């Protein structure tokens, strides 16, 4: 059983019922039936901005319910230092490097995303499930 880190974009597609991507995200998650899915506080932040900004309480509750089903991973300072190195080496955006560093730090077997830029820096850890 592997530990799989989920990028916020995939949760957004699934929870908000994106017409093109929701079913593909669900299928990708279902194909990993023996895995434990994990997120960081950064994923929560990214997911909750829209419903908080728009005041959409129903959407906020859907996010909170979905996020609460996932394993929360802490983000100690070492993750931020690793993210700085990744940003310096690969030129990725700070949130992307934090996701990757968190997955690496916690020994995740995969980081699922739709972000092609992360694949090179991830050295096989990152999988774009929407290709």
Predicted regions and their residues:
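Short, well-structured N-terminal submotif of metal-dependent ribonuclease cores
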Residues: 1-39, 51-62, 116, 130-131
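Acidic, PIN/NYN-like endoribonuclease modules and their adjacent C-terminal/linker elements
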Residues: 1-3, 70, 100-131
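Conserved glycosyltransferase catalytic-site signature
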Residues: 8, 41, 96-100
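A generic structural signal for short hydrophobic patches within well-formed alpha-helices
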Residues: 11, 44, 80, 118-119
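Acidic catalytic patch
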Residues: 17, 69-89
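Active-site charged/polar residues at nucleotide-handling catalytic sites that mediate phosphoryl
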Residues: 32, 90, 106
């Amino acid at each position: 059983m592997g530990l799989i880190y989920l990028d916020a974009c995939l949760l957004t597609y699934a929870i908000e019922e994106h017409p093109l991507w929701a079913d593909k995200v669900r299928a990708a998650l279902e194909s990993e039936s023996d895995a434990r899915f994990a997120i960081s506080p950064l994923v929560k932040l990214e997911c909750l901005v829209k419903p908080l900004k728009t005041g959409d309480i129903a959407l906020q509750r859907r996010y909170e319910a979905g996020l609460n089903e996932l394993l929360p991973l802490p983000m100690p300072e070492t993750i931020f230092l690793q993210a700085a190195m990744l940003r310096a080496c690969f030129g990725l955006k700070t949130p992307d490097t934090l996701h990757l560093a968190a997955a690496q730090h916690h020994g995740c077997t995969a980081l699922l995303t739709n972000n092609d830029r992360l694949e090179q820096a991830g050295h096989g850890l990152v999988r774009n499930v929407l290709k």
